[in-house]
């Protein structure tokens, strides 16, 4: 459920109403298997950047599946055997992952790790479709209802062989923690980009919203279909276009459906979530993609302070009730349509 998305950030130099010049200062490091970029505008010290990247590295050590010493790896190794005590951070992310699993009735399922490992999309052994028997075997290990979380911060997977994958939510949580750290250091404006999980802090110096370009799912990186104008928001996009392989002319992408065991097959090409917390945007972008347009729209309309932009394979763009106030479509090859129009067309 990991997602790598390219979101083009508009504006390098920011000017205040008084014509004072604010130059962007960016630092980047390769962490969590992706490029993490922090951009600040007030001449912050190098120590603040270092502290922010230290936060990312510390969190990754807790929840990464690629690090055998992580707390998450210890939980997975103890599945069917015993509960494992974890830190407050890991506890919060696992608890949030189960919340979204319940909310989506399993469309988002943190116990999907066995399937993710089997498909290996984005790994060195990608390129082959697993046998149906293998998929069914792994599916038997996926059930968020068998993930037990106790109030004393102990986590237990009831069946041996079960595993948790927080790839669809942890990066959002870490982005939120980085934002909290930067604000505690006096940062008033900036942009956090953790491999496509975008958080903007505050506004531009003159009080205007930041302008964030949203990737066109059918074009090369850095080509965007429109811009989101936001203040103190987070933006996360999931799509079929970043990690995939072809077999016999069919594309297999990395967003897996826990119910079928295969990559999601619906009419969506990408979905962008705009919300206040990146942990929510991260989980919702995957959840709504799995649910599809109709069920996804129903879910996003039931959630406060979160909006969605749906992009279909037919180049239609649909908005949740408040998204069109934040997002402007610039590419004229796309069509803005309502949910009613979409359902009428799609049913024909």
Regions found by a protein language model. Give the residues of each.
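Repetitive helical segments and hydrophobic/amphipathic motifs
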Residues: 11-12
């Amino acid at each position: 459920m990991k997602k790598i998305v390219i979101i083009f950030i508009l504006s390098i130099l920011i000017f205040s109403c008084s014509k004072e010049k604010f130059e962007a200062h960016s630092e980047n490091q390769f962490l969590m298997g992706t490029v993490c970029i922090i951009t600040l505008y007030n001449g912050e010290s190098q120590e603040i950047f270092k502290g922010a990247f230290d936060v990312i590295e510390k969190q990754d050590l807790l929840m990464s599946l690629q690090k055998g010493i992580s707390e998450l790896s210890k939980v997975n190794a103890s599945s069917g055997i015993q509960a494992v005590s974890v830190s407050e951070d890991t506890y919060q992310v696992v608890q949030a992952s189960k919340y979204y699993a319940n909310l989506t009735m399993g469309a988002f399922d943190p116990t999907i790790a066995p399937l993710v490992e089997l498909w290996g999309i984005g790994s060195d052994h990608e390129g082959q479709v697993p046998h149906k028997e293998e998929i069914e075997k792994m599916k038997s290990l996926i059930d968020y209802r068998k993930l037990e979380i106790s109030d004393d911060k102990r986590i237990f997977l009831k069946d041996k062989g079960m595993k948790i994958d927080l790839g669809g939510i942890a990066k959002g949580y870490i982005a939120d923690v980085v934002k909290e750290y930067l604000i505690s250091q006096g940062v008033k404006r900036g942009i956090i980009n953790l491999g496509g999980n975008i958080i903007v802090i505050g506004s531009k110096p003159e009080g205007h919203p930041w302008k964030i370009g949203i990737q066109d799912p059918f074009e090369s990186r850095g080509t965007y279909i429109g811009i989101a104008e936001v203040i103190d928001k987070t933006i996360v996009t999931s799509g079929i276009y970043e990690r995939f392989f072809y077999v016999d002319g069919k594309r297999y992408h990395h967003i897996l459906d826990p119910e079928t065991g295969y990559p999601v097959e619906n009419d969506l090409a990408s979905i962008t979530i705009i919300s206040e917390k990146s942990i929510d945007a991260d989980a919702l972008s995957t959840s709504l993609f799995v649910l599809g347009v109709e069920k996804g729209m129903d879910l996003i309309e039931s959630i406060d302070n979160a909006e969605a932009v749906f992009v279909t394979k037919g180049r239609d763009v649909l908005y949740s009730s408040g998204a069109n106030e934040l997002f402007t479509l610039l590419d004229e090859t796309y069509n803005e349509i309502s949910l009613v129009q979409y359902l009428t067309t799609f049913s024909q």
